[in-house]
Amino acid sequence: MGERHMPRFLALLQYTTEGSKVLLKEKVTVRETFARKAIESVGGKVESIYFTASGEYHIAMTAEYPDAAMAAAVIALMVSTGAVSKFNLIELITTSEIDRAYAALTDPVASGS
C-alpha cells in the first residue's frame, strides 16, 4: 500500500429509530451526501460507506481526516442530529505503518535499559 498523508478511520454507526424512519422517507444517498459534506468541511475525504449485515451497527464508513479530533467532531455532529444513537470510531493503521513502527522499537531487555 502507498503512503497516506492523513489518518484513516473506520466509523461504525447505529441509527436511532427516528434516524431509520428518515432513511425510509428520503433516499439513503441524502444521508451519504450529508456525511461527505461534513467530512470534507474539516479537510477529510470519504473512502467508502456501506450498510452492514450486523445487528449492532447499520453503517460502516472509512474516511481520512486531518487528525483524530476532526474525526471525533464529525461523528459528534452526526450524533447531534438525533439520527445516530451509538458509534465506534477506530483509527486504522496499515501493515507498512506497523512494520515501520516495529523497526523503530528498541528492545529494552536487549539494550540493557
Where on the chain are the PLM-derived regions?
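Short hydrophobic/aromatic beta-strand micro-patches
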Residues: Q14, A60-E64
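Short, flexible active-site loop motifs that bind/organize anionic cofactors or intermediates
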Residues: M1, M61, N88
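A structural preference for short, hydrophobic beta-strand core positions in alpha/beta folds
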Residues: S48-I49, L89
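A short pocket-lining beta-strand/turn micro-motif at the edge of beta-sheets
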Residues: Y57-I59, S85
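An amphipathic, aromatic/His-enriched active-site/gating alpha helix that lines ligand/cofactor pockets
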Residues: E64-T95
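Short S/T/G/P-rich N-terminal loop/turn motif that feeds into the first structured element of a domain
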Residues: G2-E40, K45, F51-E56, S96-S113
